[in-house]
Structures are given as C-alpha cells and as structure tokens.
C-alpha cells in the first residue's frame, strides 16, 4: 500500500495540481495550505506516513516548522520531502537530517514519483 501523504503548499493552484497528480499515481493525499492547517490535519489523520511541504508558506511560516510540528506528533524519524525554489539558507536548515529529501522547484513529476518510491517505500 502506498503512503498517505500530507501535502502542504500555500499556492492553491500548485496544491490542487500536485494533489491531483499524486492521487492519480495511487497515493492518498491530505492537503493543507498553512502551518496551522498542517498541524490540524496531522492530528486528525493518524495514518499519515509522509509530509511533502513547500519551504516558504504564508507569513513567516516555513516547511521546517511544518516538519517539526508533525515530528512532534509522530516522532523524529517521520519522513519529509521539501520542495522549494529557494536554494540558499533553506537548504542549510535541514543539514544532517537523514529523514528528509530536498527537491527544487519546479519539481519534475517523474522525479517526485521516483523519490517517493525510493525514499518512502516502507513508511
């Protein structure tokens, strides 16, 4: 069975398109557009296996905060994928995290599926 993914993206068009793509590939997807929504969805869906998040969200919220909040609920080895166009300081925010994968924006759909197959097969 494929992982249940929490997808966090503040751009509604990107969120909808990515969710549709992942669902078409057979994944179960729960969406959130903010840190607060991500925490709410993580609490409401105990069967989540993985989070995919944009790095920069609305206001001062970041994907790093999303991952930290979900890991507080699910444990420090909860797997995460960050998708972002920011390749500067954001990259270094995750140095040494063996349970995280980083993809640049725009994320190639076939690359995302490859990462999901290889990074999260046993979630």
Feature map (PLM): residue ranges:
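Acidic, metal-coordinating helix/loop segments flanking the phosphotransfer/catalytic sites
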Residues: 19, 31-50, 58, 91
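Conserved phosphotransfer microenvironments
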Residues: 54-71
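Two-component/phosphorelay signaling modules centered on CheY-like receiver
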Residues: 12-30
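C-terminal output helix
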Residues: 19, 107-120
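Conserved acidic carboxylate
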Residues: 9
């Amino acid at each position: 069975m494929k992982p249940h993914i929490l997808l966090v993206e503040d751009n509604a068009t990107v969120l909808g398109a990515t969710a549709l793509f992942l669902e078409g590939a057979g994944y179960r997807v729960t969406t959130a557009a903010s840190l607060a929504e991500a925490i709410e969805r993580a609490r409401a869906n105990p069967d989540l296996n993985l989070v995919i998040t944009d790095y920069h969200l609305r206001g001062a919220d970041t994907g790093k905060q999303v991952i930290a909040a979900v890991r507080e609920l699910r444990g420090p080895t909860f797997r995460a994928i960050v998708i972002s166009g920011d390749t500067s300081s954001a990259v270094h925010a995750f140095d040494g995290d063996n349970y995280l994968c980083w993809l640049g924006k725009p994320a190639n759909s076939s690359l995302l599926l490859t990462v999901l197959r290889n990074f999260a097969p046993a979630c």
